[in-house]
């Protein structure tokens, strides 16, 4: 039995798989984001640990007969978050999350003062990444910065609580801007740019390797053997790739969760920092990946539903009743509720509706939102360069994958077949598979592609209409950039 734990932004999920790769139990706990100021997004790491305990307790009840057979644990988690510990292991401040954009001024300063940083890291300097967050802390909370003994990523904080060891792995570490991504090791030069050293970083192992074993007291508390190992694991998207079997060059998937991601596997580092496409290590040795990221995806629909006091399923049902003619004249939505990464790297981008009228029903607002997210994915797909020519179909994962309407819309916008899988295909499944690999499992047997739930073929006629609306979408963003120059600071 293998346990996979995934720290998302809105929930912590965990599941158990057996040696046939079947999921035998799953559980989750809700997490919340604190936004004390504009552009800020934070969470308390202690809440992650509490949520982990809650989820483990639930799994023990669900799998009471087999729980003690767990041999290894894998970890997956939201990337880029900065957990700062002092020499006593105390958390110095709330974790600054991946979608926090307060460090935009620090990014600009780093680009001007250290132009070599993008070439060394293989990635554009963006507010979501970890290094600019630490520059912000140094400038705005110097007392805290001076006390930093270790900087951990979210899943690696859980690992430390489980094992007492400070360890990370290359797929997650690549999102810090401190990693030599080609060499899969910390870069002393990149660390020095933000006033840090290798001693403040966790050790690195590959995602499919053993990082440590459970502390004896915790193993006893959880009802597990003290010999249970904890695999290196992976950043959320790299782990999800393992979960959907995207492990060979050209394999690709789209994640439609809080954020929106297009992920393509490479056999070597393919860096193009100016494009805004991320070039990171995969969670498996000897592989890398490219990734375009939009900061707000399914979270846009959640925002609208909260605003309208309607459930997502109810609004989706209403959207499904819209005619093609109604959709053709729907408002156009810019999904930049948290700024945007790929391709714009624009923390000040904002959401907006265009073409609202008195008679616009809420179903058309909902359609505009899911269409706007699909258009954001199209912008990210457009800058993937040569990698996109290798993609013949994409798996679709995340909460948004439950919507047949959204899946078909993405297929029509990208003109690419979209495949969905059972809801179990997730970062938690990938984490469990990485645990299995760390326990001696063979990649050819462990990292299988899950069963297809549905396949969505692109429709050329609908795609033609959507391309016209996509041009409106892109024009609106350009006009928004110009209009923002007229706003007061």
Predicted regions and their residues:
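Structural signal for short hydrophobic segments within the conserved structured cores
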Residues: 25-29, 202, 454
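N-terminal glycine/serine-rich phosphate-binding loop of ATP-dependent small-molecule kinases
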Residues: 1-93, 119, 147, 219-220, ...
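A structural motif corresponding to the C-terminal end of an alpha-helix
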Residues: 193-200
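Short beta-strand-loop/turn "lid" adjacent to the catalytic site in phosphate-handling enzymes
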Residues: 62-98, 124-128, 159-180, 203-206, ...
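Residue-level signal for inorganic ion chemistry
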Residues: 21, 44, 73, 100, ...
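Active-site core segments that coordinate phosphate-bearing ligands/cofactors
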Residues: 3-4, 104, 109-129, 135-167, ...
């Amino acid at each position: 039995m293998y346990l996979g734990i995934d720290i998302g932004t809105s929930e912590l999920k965990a599941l158990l798989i057996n040696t046939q790769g079947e999921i035998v139990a799953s559980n989750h706990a809700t997490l919340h984001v604190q936004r004390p100021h504009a552009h800020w997004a934070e969470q308390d790491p202690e809440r992650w640990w509490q949520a982990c305990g809650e989820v483990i307790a639930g799994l023990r009840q669900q799998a009471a007969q087999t729980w003690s057979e767990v041999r290894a644990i894998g970890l997956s988690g939201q990337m880029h978050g900065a957990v700062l510990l002092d020499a006593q292991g105390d958390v110095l401040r709330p974790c600054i999350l991946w979608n926090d954009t307060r460090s935009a001024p620090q990014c600009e300063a780093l680009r001007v003062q250290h132009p070599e940083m993008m070439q060394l890291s293989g990635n554009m300097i963006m507010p979501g990444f970890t290094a600019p967050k630490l520059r912000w802390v140094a400038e705005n909370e110097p007392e805290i910065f001076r006390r930093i003994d270790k900087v951990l990523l979210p899943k690696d904080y859980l690992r430390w609580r489980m094992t007492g060891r400070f360890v990370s792995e290359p797929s997650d570490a690549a999102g810090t801007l401190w990693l030599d991504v080609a060499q899969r090791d910390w870069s002393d030069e990149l660390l020095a740019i933000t006033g840090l050293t290798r001693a403040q970083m966790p050790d690195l192992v590959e995602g499919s390797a053993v990082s440590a074993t459970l502390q004896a007291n915790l193993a006893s508390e959880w009802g597990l053997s003290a010999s249970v190992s904890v695999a290196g694991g992976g950043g959320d998207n790299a782990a999800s790739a393992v979960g959907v079997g995207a492990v060979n060059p050209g394999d690709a998937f789209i994640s439609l969760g809080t954020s929106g991601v297009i992920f393509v596997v490479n056999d070597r580092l393919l860096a193009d920092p100016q494009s805004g496409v991320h070039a990171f290590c995969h969670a498996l040795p000897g592989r890398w990946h490219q990734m375009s990221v939009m900061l707000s995806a399914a979270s846009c629909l959640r925002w609208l539903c909260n605003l309208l006091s309607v459930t997502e399923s109810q609004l989706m049902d209403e959207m499904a009743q819209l005619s093609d003619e109604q959709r053709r004249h729907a408002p156009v939505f810019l999904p930049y509720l948290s700024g945007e990464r790929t391709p714009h790297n624009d923390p000040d981008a904002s959401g907006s509706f265009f073409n609202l009228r008195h008679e616009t029903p809420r179903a058309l607002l909902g359609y505009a939102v899911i269409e706007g997210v699909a258009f954001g994915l199209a912008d990210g797909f457009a800058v993937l360069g040569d990698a996109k020519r290798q993609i013949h179909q994409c798996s679709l994962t995340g909460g948004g994958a439950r919507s047949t309407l959204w899946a078909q819309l993405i297929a029509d916008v990208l003109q690419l077949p979209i495949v969905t899988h059972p809801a179990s295909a997730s970062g938690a499944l990938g984490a469990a598979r990485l645990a299995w690999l760390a326990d001696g499992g063979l990649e050819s047997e462990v990292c299988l592609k899950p069963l297809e739930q549905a396949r969505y073929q692109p429709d050329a006629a609908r795609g033609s209409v959507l391309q016209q609306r996509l041009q409106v979408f892109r024009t609106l963003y350009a006009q928004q950039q110009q209009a923002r120059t007229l706003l007061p600071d």
